[in-house]
Amino acid sequence: MQLNSNSIIKSGHNDNGYYRKYADGTLEMWGSKRFDNVDIQTPDNWNYYTGSRANVPLPMESKTWVSVTATAAGSCAPWISIPSNGLGTELFQAWIYSSNKSASETITIFWRCFGTWK
């Protein structure tokens, strides 16, 4: 009896992160991306955000838009928002928010996503 026929076919990594290809066509990717000198000064109600989206490149192109789970870390207690039009096949985009206004922050986005490779 075979318990799981959805075996890992290939796995690897590059500068953009790690990936696994599964037999059923699922593509799993994960990693982190550091952003230096992030300007978080655009007001949004009682918070602040970056004036442009942060681009997070994926380690491998997906055949479909990816589904992303991500979080942010930094001294300004940041969080992120990934808009639906920020999802792609080669990267995803995120707005970085904070309750603290800052002209120069170092933020790391930790992420995991799923797409397809076939």
What are the residue ranges of the model-derived segments?
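Glycine-rich, low-complexity segments
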Residues: 1-30, 34-37
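Extracellular attachment/recognition segments
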Residues: 26-118
